[in-house]
Amino acid sequence: MTMSDPIADMLTRIRNANTAKHDTVDVPASKMKIAIAEILLKEGYIKSFEIEEVGSFKTIHITLKYGKDKNEKVITGLKRISKPGLRVYANSTELPRVLGGLGVAIISTNKGVLTDKAARNANVGGEVLAFIW
């Protein structure tokens, strides 16, 4: 059976692994998911990620990040905004701020997948994929 929302599946896998205090999580790879993982790494929400290829099947191996001990989570919340049944778009002036600027909104634009701050600076809008805080 095919997956109706692979991005929500990725975010759910990360959320579940973070809640269970796992060190790593594996996610089936796609260009969009790799771009989201790059944003998570750049913003400091994950330690690292690498793409592993087994035959023709690629997976993203994500290493999660915690505070001094595993009880301090770096990712406190992940929320999928635009869904297959209800797409959410915003222009550059309407881009949302997550927790007053403390979190990050991931936006899919014509210039690639960007954070809300980068999209505002580039003066582009797009589909609001997810919030991370």
Curated annotation (Swiss-Prot):
Function as written in the Swiss-Prot or TrEMBL entry: One of the primary rRNA binding proteins, it binds directly to 16S rRNA central domain where it helps coordinate assembly of the platform of the 30S subunit.
One GO cellular component term: ribosome
Family assignment from sequence similarity: Belongs to the universal ribosomal protein uS8 family.
Any GO MF annotation of the entry: rRNA binding
Domain of life assignment: Bacteria
Organism: Lachnoclostridium phytofermentans (strain ATCC 700394 / DSM 18823 / ISDg) (Clostridium phytofermentans)
Pfam families: Ribosomal_S8
Matching InterPro entries: Ribosomal_uS8, Ribosomal_uS8_CS, Ribosomal_uS8_sf
Cleaved signal peptide residues: none
rRNA-binding in keyword set: yes
Presence of the UniProt keyword tRNA processing in the record: no
Keywords: Ribonucleoprotein, Ribosomal protein, RNA-binding, rRNA-binding
Descriptive protein name: Small ribosomal subunit protein uS8
Subunit structure: Part of the 30S ribosomal subunit. Contacts proteins S5 and S12.
Example GO biological process: translation
